Amino acid sequence: RHTVGEGDSPDALTLAPSVAHDLPELGVMLPYTPLQHLLLAAAASHDMHALVMTSGNLSEEPIETDDGLAWEHLIAAGIADALLGNDRAILSRYDDSVVRVVDGTVMPVRRARGYAPQPLPLPALNGTAPCVLACGPQQKATIAFTREDANGEAACFVSQHIGDVENGGTFDAWNAARTRLEDLFDLAPAALACDLHPSYLSGQWAREQARKCNLPLVEVQHHHAHIASAMAEAIVAGRLALDARVLGIAFDGTGAGTDGTIWGCLLYTSPSPR
């Protein structure tokens, strides 16, 4: 452990060559609980120079919230050597948030602990925003819904980062996050939105729920969703007029296309984000 002070030379902080050796940037994790301060202090007193911080879960599985299951899945499996528990139950899984500082502005990359479900303002929809539950994609999934905030203004409430909804365990975590949002905000969705891909678990749930509850369902093409979200962000920031004509270009892997084939990118023109 070494503290770098103002005025120190760049050589004051040295890292092992194996740490992010091919990356131009480093991430910094701040201790956000008193327990982490105690762990860091104990490590320093025992001349431990490094601690590995990672989420408590198996690969492709949700974070463990139950001590018994954590013991079974993490300790018995050899992932960890010991388990430090607490007498307070964990109600909701939250990963560490990840942010970047761009031109002096903090830009969230992964909104989770400390950020979600903080609302994002949608002033262009004031007075016209129905309660729409958006079920998210399959990879790096979140859930979102639109409704009025405490001040009566239109807003989008985004869940914590959930991860890749590809199996029963992660779908259960997705479902738990959705249920918690609905209970917390007393939601009564007037419509549902999901990814166009027919095999995504979140989309399958949305289609079945829309059928059972006789709700409108909007199926959104994957790349189109990226372009629309970038447009909405620019409108909220005042950089784009609501009726501006836009050429959107999205390169983000593959996604189900409106013609039934798999698309790799999308060039899209729109008279407005609506």
Give residue spans per PLM region:
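Active-site-adjacent structural elements in enzyme catalytic cores
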Residues: R1-A193, H197-K212, T261-G264
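Phosphate/diphosphate-binding loops
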Residues: A76, A80-V98, E219-I235, R239-W263
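Conserved small/polar residues in nucleotide/adenosyl-binding loops
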Residues: Y268-P273
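Short hydrophobic/aromatic-enriched beta-strand-loop microsegments
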Residues: L51, P216-Q221
